[in-house]
From Swiss-Prot:
Known role: Catalyzes the condensation of ATP and 5-phosphoribose 1-diphosphate to form N'-(5'-phosphoribosyl)-ATP (PR-ATP). Has a crucial role in the pathway because the rate of histidine biosynthesis seems to be controlled primarily by regulation of HisG enzymatic activity.
Species whose genome carries this gene: Anaeromyxobacter dehalogenans (strain 2CP-C)
Comment on protein domains: Lacks the C-terminal regulatory region which is replaced by HisZ.
Protein EC: 2.4.2.17
UniProt-recorded name of the protein: ATP phosphoribosyltransferase
Cystine pairs: none
Keyword ATP-binding: yes
Assembly: Heteromultimer composed of HisG and HisZ subunits.
Alphabetic keyword roster: Amino-acid biosynthesis, ATP-binding, Cytoplasm, Glycosyltransferase, Histidine biosynthesis, Nucleotide-binding, Transferase
InterPro entries in the cross-refs: ATP_PRibTrfase_cat (IPR013820), ATP_PRibTrfase_CS (IPR018198), ATP_PRibTrfase_HisG (IPR001348), ATP_PRibTrfase_HisG_short (IPR024893)
Amino acid sequence: MPGTSELITVAVPKGRLLQESSALFERALGVSPRKLLEGTRKLAADAPEAGLRFISIRAGDVASYVEHGAAEVGIVGLDVLREEPRDLYEPLDLGIGRCTVIVARPKGARPLPRGVAPRVATKYLSLAARHFAAKGVPAEIIPLHGSIEVAPSLGLADTIVDITETGETLRANGLVIEEKVLEVSARLVVNRVALKLHPERLRLLIEALRAAVAAADAEAR
């Protein structure tokens, strides 16, 4: 059994992904990050029997923790990884947290006149800019961090780039999906230095999770 100082630190995002990833860890290793973290007011909890320490942090910060070595392993949405590319090893699609980054506009809105750059409200500044640039469309990107769906109705934007799971919030705000930008799911990411320092332990962790993902997929069919 590894000592406390030898535990592999796994950064897990708060919210829905914590619950979904906990089911995978429980299947793979018999430990649930959610149950461990619920039992403490701290943002870290140890599972020495599995050689792991779990830390619960904001989803958007997981990649930074892993890239800079504060955690060896993390769970990150593909949207985060493609919005701001990181120097991380991505060995596994966990198949959880499935969503889609989309372009949406008001239902029944008339097309903009040729040559007029659309005003695009989004938190995905890079993804949106790259998407419209690839189409040869000059776009004015308006950065927002919340309530993006109301931007068109308030006259702030002509269209939005946002992430959706069911599309219900879009429909409730009178928006229709125009294009899909990126299919998203959560990925396992690993610090590249840690991969050299703990190759065998990380290989076993990755393979255990890979088997858990495969089993979950088989059950879902």
